[in-house]
């Protein structure tokens, strides 16, 4: 038993020495392996342009896929020419100028007067003077007295010549051919009628 103990004691140090002797060899092997293995190099990032070329998620701003921008797509700061103003868009005056207002007032009065009719009654003088089928007529007051004479001559079928004349009177005087019927009516009308006497020969001076 003692011998076995001694044998065991002799063998144990040998195994311990052998195990401890193997440690440096393994360490040297690991160190040699680390030296043989190249160090990893940092991964190089691709360029941004190359990424854009192959990246399907790029936006149209980074990598436009459509046609290039045209002049119509650009923002133009040049002001557009103004269109001519239409009549509906023209300014509305709050009041007319004094001269224009007076002119319109005069025209309005003349227009109203042109629609006013004066009643005339024709009365023949002398036995040889023909009478009209109808003795009462109406005429616009803006007409001249020469229109009345022309109308009477046409109704009586009297030619305008030296041998055949017609004389027209209001009361006892012969009005001028350029006088207006309205003026004569306002001065000499009786009971709403302006009586015009006529004859083929001169009756009053």
From Swiss-Prot:
Q: What is this protein called?
A: Ubiquitin-like protein ATG12
Q: Where is this region: Disordered?
A: 1-86
Ranges of Acidic residues compositional bias? 1-13
Role according to the record = Ubiquitin-like protein involved in cytoplasm to vacuole transport (Cvt), autophagy vesicles formation, mitophagy, and nucleophagy. Conjugation with ATG5 through a ubiquitin-like conjugating system involving also ATG7 as an E1-like activating enzyme and ATG10 as an E2-like conjugating enzyme, is essential for its function. The ATG12-ATG5 conjugate functions as an E3-like enzyme which is required for lipidation of ATG8 and ATG8 association to the vesicle membranes.
State the organism named in the record: Yarrowia lipolytica (strain CLIB 122 / E 150)
Gene name per UniProt: ATG12
How does this polypeptide assemble, per the annotation?
Answer: Forms a conjugate with ATG5.
Q: Which residues cross the membrane?
A: none
| Cell location | Preautophagosomal structure membrane
Where do we see the Glycyl lysine isopeptide (Gly-Lys) (interchain with K-112 in ATG5) cross-link in this protein? 205
Query: What topology in the membrane does the UniProt record assign?
Result: Peripheral membrane protein
Q: Which InterPro entries match?
A: Atg12, Ubiquitin-like_domsf
Q: Which domain of life is it from?
A: Eukaryota
A single GO molecular function term of this UniProt record: protein tag activity
Q: Where is the composition biased (Polar residues)?
A: 57-80
Write down the Pfam families for this protein, in alphabetical order. Answer: APG12
Q: Which PANTHER family match?
A: AUTOPHAGY PROTEIN 12, UBIQUITIN-LIKE PROTEIN ATG12
Query: Main subcellular localization, coarse class?
Result: membrane
GO BP annotation list: autophagosome assembly; autophagosome maturation; autophagy of mitochondrion; glycophagy; piecemeal microautophagy of the nucleus; protein transport
Which keywords are on file for this protein? Autophagy, Isopeptide bond, Membrane, Protein transport, Transport, Ubl conjugation pathway
């Amino acid at each position: 038993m003692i011998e076995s103990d001694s044998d065991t004691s002799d063998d144990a140090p040998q195994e311990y020495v052998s195990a401890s002797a193997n440690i440096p060899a393994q360490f040297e092997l690991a160190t040699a392996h680390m030296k043989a293995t190249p160090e990893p190099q940092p991964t190089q990032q691709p360029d941004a342009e190359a990424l854009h070329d192959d990246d399907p998620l790029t936006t149209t701003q980074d990598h436009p896929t459509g046609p290039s921008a045209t002049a119509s797509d650009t923002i133009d700061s040049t002001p557009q020419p103004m269109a001519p103003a239409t009549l509906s868009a023209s300014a509305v005056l709050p009041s007319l100028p004094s001269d224009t207002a007076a002119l319109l007032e005069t025209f309005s009065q003349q227009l109203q007067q042109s629609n006013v009719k004066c009643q005339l009654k024709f009365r023949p003088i002398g036995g040889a003077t023909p009478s009209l089928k109808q003795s009462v007529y109406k005429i616009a007051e803006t007409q001249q007295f020469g229109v009345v004479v022309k109308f009477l001559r046409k109704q009586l079928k009297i030619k305008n010549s030296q041998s055949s004349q017609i004389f027209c009177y209001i009361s006892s005087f012969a009005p001028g051919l350029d006088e207006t019927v309205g003026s004569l009516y306002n001065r000499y009308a009786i009971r709403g009628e302006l009586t015009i006497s006529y004859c083929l020969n001169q009756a009053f001076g």
